[in-house]
Regions:
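A conserved ligand/cofactor-binding region detector
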Residues: 2-202
């Protein structure tokens, strides 16, 4: 489900309201910075000054995921308590792309996170480019499935997608000595901060 946690401020607000809005934004940015720094220490197990760009990406993704999970569970509880029917979408492929910028946009958190990251001395565009495409398929079927899921979320339709967690769902190509060579896509090589392992249900 798509949520707007921090709606854009009305441009017609009076000066006091505008100052409060800026103060709220500053508070959100400070909270995000603190959370990212905590993830660097507690998840990567590193001193902040020794963190590399991949560590910063993982910390940022997990900080955002924390905020998504609360909304996700709230939505699930609401659907269950209301007795809403839900859609279970089965597909062999789900080409969901890169989730960081997509989730930041859907949660209306792009600017606070960008500001927080750059205040910490990290280039946001470089951090964003660290994330690999999720190699969960290689064709139009996967893109269509992802679009269906996005549409249902936008329409607030309770839905769950089920597919296959491919380790090598795509391949990469290089040209070496005039010959094309293909290699499996190692998208999980450094882990996936967006997933929850459910070893108890496998």
């Amino acid at each position: 489900m798509v949520f707007k946690l921090f709606p854009k401020q009305d441009r017609n607000l009076d000066d006091d309201s505008s100052m409060r809005a800026r103060s709220d934004d500053d508070g959100i940015v400070a909270e995000i910075k603190s959370a990212i720094l905590s993830k660097i220490i507690l998840v990567a197990g590193k001193d902040v000054k020794h963190a590399n760009i991949h560590d910063w990406y993982i910390a940022t993704a997990l900080t955002l995921r924390d905020r998504i999970v609360y909304q996700w569970l709230q939505s699930d509880r609401s659907a269950r308590s209301n007795g809403d029917k839900r859609v279970y979408y089965l597909s062999l492929e789900f080409l969901i792309g890169r989730l960081l910028t997509d989730a930041l946009t859907n949660m209306s958190l792009m600017e606070p996170f960008r500001t927080a990251i750059e205040d910490l001395g990290i280039n946001f565009d470089e951090l964003r480019d660290v994330e690999p495409d999720a190699a969960l398929g290689n064709g139009g079927l996967g893109r269509l499935a992802a679009c269906f899921m996005e549409s249902m979320a936008t329409l607030a339709i309770p839905a769950q997608g089920y597919g296959i967690r491919y380790e090598h769902g795509l391949f990469r190509q290089i040209v070496s000595n005039g010959w094309q060579e293909e290699f499996p896509e190692q998208w999980l090589l450094s882990g996936n901060p967006w997933e929850f392992e459910r070893s108890d249900v496998i």
